[in-house]
């Protein structure tokens, strides 16, 4: 009798770099090799095999190589047949340059779960707009150089199952809504309006985040989504981290804060708005699904999300008993 031999492989996490690289110094002239090595070492400690795409250690200006090299790196990540998860090294700027250069049908055929954030929200959008493929918004690879139990627990829990559950604190009005759960970086979303890579989603629940944008600019971007007919076609808006939004809000009668901006948007869009979700450019960011059906409810102080059909990798380190020396146990 012939005994069947099963090959067991360790889960593979592919790191790619469609935008900027981490740099050192005020002149941004040197590649921060140490931070990249540190993040990959921590990912390996969590049980991943880590593979870099060919452009990850390249540097042209502040980018991870030329536009062609970065596009090839992104395609390489999606073409890797053993990939379980794709993380981007960091955000910054430059991903949108690559959108016409990627074969999105090939990318959509990948079994890997793509995780975007910040500038790489452009990839989430293009994947869904062209192929309908679900993905994630969550931490960039470089974030893992620093231990953060809350971030890591959220990341691991999210990827475990095709059904996603979340209960989190927010502020705003009570509502119940069902629809496609999607979103990401507000500046990137608005920059894609009118392009082939912007998702056409009606009756969705849109979540947004940003960093270093004052309240008036946040309002202006949300107003663009209203006037483009995007926000008014959603059932609710969830606002995540807006780090630095009130830094230049001013004082006294002339003060204009994020809460002022969101109150105006709520009136104009005529949809419920919840704010304060721990998601975005935050050390303990949540990981959220992109492009999946969901049921969302808020009582004004807490938000409950159940999402279905999420991108759950076939192989994850924490699905099996982890080695005893892993730092999060």
Put a short name on every predicted segment:
Residues 241-329:
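ATP/nucleoside-binding phosphotransfer catalytic cores, i.e., glycine-rich phosphate-binding loops
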Residues 11, 82, 107-113, 131-133, ...:
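A short helix->loop->beta-strand "cap" motif at the edges of active sites that frequently abuts
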Residues 132-194:
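Conserved anion/nucleotide-ligand pocket segment
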Residues 1-82:
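ATP/NTP phosphate-donor binding region
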Residues 102-126, 134-141, 272:
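Short, acidic/small-residue loops that bind anionic groups at enzyme active sites
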Residues 200-258:
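Internal helical hairpin/lid segments
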Residues 85-96, 117:
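N-terminal glycine-rich "phosphate-gripper" loop used for MgATP/nucleotide binding
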Residues 52-54, 116, 234-241, 274-276:
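Short internal beta-strands
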């Amino acid at each position: 009798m012939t005994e069947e031999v099963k090959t067991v492989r360790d889960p593979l996490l592919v790191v790619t770099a469609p935008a900027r690289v981490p740099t050192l110094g005020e002149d941004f002239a040197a590649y921060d090799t140490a931070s990249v090595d540190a993040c990959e070492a921590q990912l390996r400690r969590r049980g991943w095999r880590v593979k870099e795409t060919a452009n990850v250690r390249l540097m042209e200006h502040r980018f991870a190589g030329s536009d062609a090299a970065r596009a090839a790196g992104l395609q390489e990540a999606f073409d890797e047949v053993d990939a379980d998860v794709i993380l981007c090294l960091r955000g910054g700027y430059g991903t949108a340059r690559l959108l016409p250069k990627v074969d999105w049908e090939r990318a959509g055929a990948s079994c890997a779960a793509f995780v975007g954030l910040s500038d790489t929200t452009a990839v989430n959008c293009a994947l869904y707009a062209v192929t309908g493929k679900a993905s994630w918004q969550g931490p960039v690879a470089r974030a893992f150089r620093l231990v953060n139990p809350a971030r890591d627990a959220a990341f691991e829990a999210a990827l475990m199952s095709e059904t996603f559950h979340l209960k989190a604190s927010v502020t705003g009005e009570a509502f119940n809504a069902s629809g496609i759960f999607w979103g990401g970086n507000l500046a990137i979303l608005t920059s894609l309006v009118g392009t082939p890579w912007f998702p056409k989603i009606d009756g969705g629940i849109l979540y947004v985040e940003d960093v270093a944008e004052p309240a008036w600019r946040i309002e202006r971007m949300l107003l663009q989504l209203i006037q483009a007919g995007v926000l008014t076609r959603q059932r609710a808006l969830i606002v995540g981290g807006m780090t630095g939004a009130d830094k230049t809000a001013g004082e006294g009668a002339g003060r204009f804060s994020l809460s002022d901006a969101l109150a105006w948007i709520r009136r104009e869009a005529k949809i419920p708005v919840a704010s304060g979700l721990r998601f975005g450019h935050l050390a303990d960011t949540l990981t959220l699904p992109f492009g999946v059906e969901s049921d969302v409810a808020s009582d004004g102080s807490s938000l409950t999300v159940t999402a279905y059909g999420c991108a759950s990798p076939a192989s994850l380190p924490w699905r099996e008993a982890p080695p005893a020396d892993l730092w999060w146990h």
